[in-house]
């Protein structure tokens, strides 16, 4: 890997598939942009299952690690295409939300940590990855996450890229909703 001013690049290769992840945070913006490029270096077509994963905080690190009775009931998400919106407490007392999106249509997704990782599992060996697909879970309460699953076929020598964005957005109080219960995403 290598790091520069505001960016990092990670590279790896296994079984004839090269992967490059380029990560940067634009100056002045509350977001991170990632580009994952996969290249098939073999002479035959290859089919891959690619998963992304972020674990959303609940906006207060001290409460996240101590106020469990509250945390088990507050997680809230909205999914639109390949965008997963983390809107915990947006209706009640927040004017901000987070979004994790991709520029490629998903095969499946998860927004519940228990569904993606497994009830007693973790990011080291997520249940969804072991199963080869997500379950399209919608988090209601504890542990909202953003996980995408892409089923990708690469021809011999072909390269494909997926762009991911993780952002934080604030809306003025009077412009919070586009419709009842639907966050304003403009």
Place the predicted regions along the sequence by residue:
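Conserved catalytic alpha/beta cores of large enzymes that bind or transform nucleotide phosphates
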Residues: 1-20
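Polysaccharide-binding surfaces and accessory modules of carbohydrate-active proteins
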Residues: 8-11, 24-131, 173-186
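Beta-strand-rich interaction surfaces with strong enrichment in secreted/lumenal proteins
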Residues: 10, 21-24, 136-139, 149-154
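Short acidic/polar mixed-charge low-complexity motifs
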Residues: 15-17, 44, 158
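Short beta-strand and strand-turn-strand segments in soluble, beta-rich domains
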Residues: 17, 63-69, 138-148
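Short alpha-helical segments and helix-capping/turn motifs at coil-helix boundaries
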Residues: 20-22, 32-35, 84, 145-153
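Short Pro-Gly-centered flexible turn/kink motifs
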Residues: 46, 152-170
């Amino acid at each position: 890997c290598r790091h520069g001013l505001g960016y990092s690049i990670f590279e790896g290769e296994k079984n004839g598939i090269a992967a490059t992840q380029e990560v940067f945070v634009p100056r002045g913006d509350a977001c991170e942009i990632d580009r994952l490029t996969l290249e098939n270096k073999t002479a035959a077509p290859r089919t891959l299952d690619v998963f992304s994963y972020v674990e959303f905080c609940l906006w207060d690190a001290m409460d996240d690690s101590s106020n469990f009775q509250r945390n088990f009931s507050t997680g809230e998400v909205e999914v639109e295409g390949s965008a997963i919106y983390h809107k915990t407490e947006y209706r009640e007392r927040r004017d901000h939300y987070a979004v994790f999106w991709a520029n490629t249509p998903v095969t499946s997704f998860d927004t519940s940590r228990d569904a993606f990782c497994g009830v007693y599992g973790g990011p080291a060996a997520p249940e969804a990855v072991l199963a080869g697909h997500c379950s399209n879970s919608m988090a209601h309460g504890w542990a909202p996450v953003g996980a995408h699953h892409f089923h990708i076929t690469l021809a011999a020598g072909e390269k494909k890229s997926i762009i991911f964005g993780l952002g934080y957005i604030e809306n003025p109080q009077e412009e919070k909703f586009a419709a009842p219960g639907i966050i304003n995403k403009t």
